[in-house]
Amino acid sequence: MLALKISVYSVVFFFIGIFVFGFLASDPSRTPSRKDLED
């Protein structure tokens, strides 16, 4: 049961990480660091 719980949490955090990374990468206009890079 412990191995099943660990595997489920691993998959959940993996998809959450992909979602957050994709959201930040697809919407760079809202991040202030984009303007710093353009300067």
Swiss-Prot record:
GO biological process, one term: photosynthesis
Domain of life: Eukaryota
Topology term for the membrane: Single-pass membrane protein
Entry keyword set: Membrane, Organellar chromatophore, Photosynthesis, Photosystem II, Plastid, Reaction center, Thylakoid, Transmembrane, Transmembrane helix
Record keyword Oxidoreductase present: no
Bilayer-crossing regions: 6-26
One of the record's GO cellular component terms: organellar chromatophore thylakoid membrane
Record localization: Plastid, Organellar chromatophore thylakoid membrane
Function (record text): One of the components of the core complex of photosystem II (PSII), required for its stability and/or assembly. PSII is a light-driven water:plastoquinone oxidoreductase that uses light energy to abstract electrons from H(2)O, generating O(2) and a proton gradient subsequently used for ATP formation. It consists of a core antenna complex that captures photons, and an electron transfer chain that converts photonic excitation into a charge separation.
Family: Belongs to the PsbI family.
PANTHER family given in the database record: PHOTOSYSTEM II REACTION CENTER PROTEIN I
Protein name per the record: Photosystem II reaction center protein I
Species name: Paulinella chromatophora
